């Protein structure tokens, strides 16, 4: 598929595409799409956006989520998005917990830089949609255009009033 006229949008997963859970989404049954999110993804594709997901999954390092289950969760997400007429081109994830001090976990921008390299895009031309302050800081650090949704943790993030300046 030719993508020269397609823009890239990066979405966080939990709280943006699927319902946020206290704890972790550890099985496909626990992954529940937010009402309207699957149709929104399809509309993004119809508007010539290529959709990529960037997600922190600390449950892996903490032993609460296996790679096998993560793959099954993502297979379910892909299937539901495709059934709604959309497509996710790639999913990038960090398996580390916050105390691991890794470089791939948001708010570090490394995951976003990896996406830019793989898709050969300039991050200042990319929209990033997330629901946490870490999402906003990661996007801002590399010049993405950050958008905060009010689903998931977005309402609390907005209410805290600590968003990076535009």
Regions found by a protein language model. Give the residues of each.
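Flexible, glycine- and charge-enriched loops at secondary-structure boundaries
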Residues: 27-34, 66-71, 105
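Generic anion/oxyanion-binding catalytic loop in active/binding sites
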Residues: 26-29, 59, 101, 128
């Amino acid at each position: 598929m030719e993508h020269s006229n397609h823009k890239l949008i990066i979405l966080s997963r939990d709280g943006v595409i699927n319902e946020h859970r206290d704890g972790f989404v550890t099985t496909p049954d626990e992954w529940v799409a937010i009402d309207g999110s699957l149709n929104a993804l399809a509309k993004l594709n119809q508007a010539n956006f290529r959709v990529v997901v960037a997600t922190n999954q600390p449950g892996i390092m903490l032993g609460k989520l296996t790679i096998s289950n993560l793959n099954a969760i993502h297979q379910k997400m892909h299937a539901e998005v495709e059934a709604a007429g959309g497509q996710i081109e790639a999913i990038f994830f960090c398996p580390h917990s916050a105390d691991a001090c890794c470089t791939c976990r948001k708010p570090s921008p490394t995951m976003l830089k990896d996406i830019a390299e793989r898709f050969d895009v300039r991050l200042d031309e990319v929209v990033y949609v997330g629901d946490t302050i870490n999402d906003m800081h990661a996007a801002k650090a590399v010049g993405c255009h950050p958008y905060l949704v009010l689903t998931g943790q977005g309402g609390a993030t907005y209410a805290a009033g600590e968003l990076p300046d535009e």
